[in-house]
């Protein structure tokens, strides 16, 4: 159990970091496209 946490924690952290960094510019683009028109 502890070994599974040690193995998966860095993987989950890396995935969360990647998703966060992908969504941030995408969300800014979304706001620029949809909220900026009106």
Swiss-Prot record:
One Pfam short name: PsbY
Membrane disposition: Single-pass membrane protein
Segments crossing the lipid bilayer: 4-22
Domain of life: Bacteria
Tagged with keyword tRNA processing: no
Subunit organization: PSII is composed of 1 copy each of membrane proteins PsbA, PsbB, PsbC, PsbD, PsbE, PsbF, PsbH, PsbI, PsbJ, PsbK, PsbL, PsbM, PsbT, PsbX, PsbY, Psb30/Ycf12, peripheral proteins PsbO, CyanoQ (PsbQ), PsbU, PsbV and a large number of cofactors. It forms dimeric complexes.
Record-stated family: Belongs to the PsbY family.
Protein name: Photosystem II reaction center protein Y
């Amino acid at each position: 159990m502890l070994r599974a946490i040690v193995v998966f924690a860095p993987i989950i952290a890396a995935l969360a970091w990647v998703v966060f960094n992908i969504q941030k510019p995408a969300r800014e683009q979304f706001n620029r496209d949809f909220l900026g028109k009106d």
